[in-house]
């Protein structure tokens, strides 16, 4: 049995074992809850104050939120409170440029890049990102928009790619000051709705484990997983994908980083080949805008480090609006 197929079985087993625990509101071993926001009720409002080790998650936690009156407002208020509590129970790192973070988030993210290769340059708008939101205290969904690809060559056809989806189930986490670490199961997928030139033509599943560990201002975030076309595909083949990001919180709003992004091809047209990219980058944020809404930015350049590569360079720009 090949490596990627074994990995798919392993990912399914991990999700089966962890699912009952994922849906609980408590976090960590021993069933003890991680620190949460302390809420003080007043006649006209509710004020949430962060506990020690929760600072920096959202400046808006120190602000006063009007008490909801209608049914929809109460549901929205409870959902936002769940998001604040969930983020308080995990590290407060910024998401890397290319590596998927194991943190659970509520944010709108838009990525764009320009890559160059033997066939010329290509612009991508969307980058497989979109709206990320919580559906349970330890479960997050992402619904993306099909990315739009625009070649730079005169006369070349542009078009939309497939619809990206993602589920995150947090298995373990500790906030800063209490371990600063996490482990998350990720299941990505693409729905074949794109143009034939830029879509895969088949659904693709991408199971992975995301990990992270911080020490002071330094943290390491990474993922290891695969890309598995449903029903097999002689063109795409199976892929083993590994990403690791080393990040440093240099100043209040600056997060320089360096990533290693590797893909090992099994079957398909690139069977037996591998490609590795080094990705220096810089993150900026989070800047409080209003209420729970914040702004963060990131940019980086992937540089091919192996003889075989499907493209030479990729300059990436990422806009995030956490809420």
Provide a role label for each language-model segment.
Residues 1-9:
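Bacterial N-terminal signal peptides that target proteins for export
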Residues 4, 13, 28-31:
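N-terminal targeting leaders only when they are immediately followed by extended low-complexity/repeat-rich tracts
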Residues 9-18:
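Bacterial N-terminal signal peptides
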Residues 26-323:
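Transmembrane beta-barrel domains of Gram-negative outer membranes and organellar outer membranes
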Residues 19-25:
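Sec/Tat signal peptide C-region and signal peptidase I cleavage site
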């Amino acid at each position: 049995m090949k490596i990627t197929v074994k990995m798919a079985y392993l990912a399914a087993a991990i999700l089966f074992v962890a699912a009952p625990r994922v849906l609980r509101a408590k976090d960590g071993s021993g069933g003890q809850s991680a620190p949460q926001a302390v809420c003080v009720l007043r006649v006209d409002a509710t004020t949430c104050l962060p506990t020690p080790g929760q600072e920096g998650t959202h400046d808006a936690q120190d602000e006063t939120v009007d008490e909801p009156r209608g049914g929809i407002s109460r549901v929205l208020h409870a959902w936002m409170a769940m998001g604040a509590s969930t983020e308080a129970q995990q590290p407060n790192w910024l998401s890397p440029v290319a590596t998927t973070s194991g943190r659970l988030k509520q944010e709108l993210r838009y990525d764009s890049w320009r890559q160059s290769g033997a066939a010329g340059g290509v612009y991508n708008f969307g980058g497989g990102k979109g709206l990320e939101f919580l559906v349970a205290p330890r479960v997050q969904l992402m619904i993306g928009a099909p990315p739009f690809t625009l070649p730079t060559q005169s006369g070349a056809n542009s078009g939309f790619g497939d619809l990206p989806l993602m589920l995150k189930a947090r298995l373990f986490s500790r906030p800063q000051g209490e371990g600063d670490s996490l482990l998350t199961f990720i299941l990505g997928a693409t729905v074949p709705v794109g143009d034939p030139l830029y879509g895969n033509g088949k659904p693709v599943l991408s199971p992975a484990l995301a990990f992270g560990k911080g020490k002071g201002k330094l943290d390491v975030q990474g993922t290891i997983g695969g890309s598995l076309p449903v029903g097999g595909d002689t063109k795409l083949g199976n892929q083993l994908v590994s990403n690791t990001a080393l990040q440093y919180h240099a100043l209040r709003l600056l997060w320089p980083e360096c990533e290693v992004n590797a893909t090992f091809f099994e079957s398909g047209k690139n069977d037996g080949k591998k490609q590795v990219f080094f990705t220096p980058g810089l993150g900026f944020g989070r800047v409080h805008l209003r209420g729970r809404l914040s702004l963060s930015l990131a940019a980086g350049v992937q540089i091919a480090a192996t003889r075989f590569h499907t493209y030479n360079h990729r300059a990436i720009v990422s806009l995030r609006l956490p809420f």
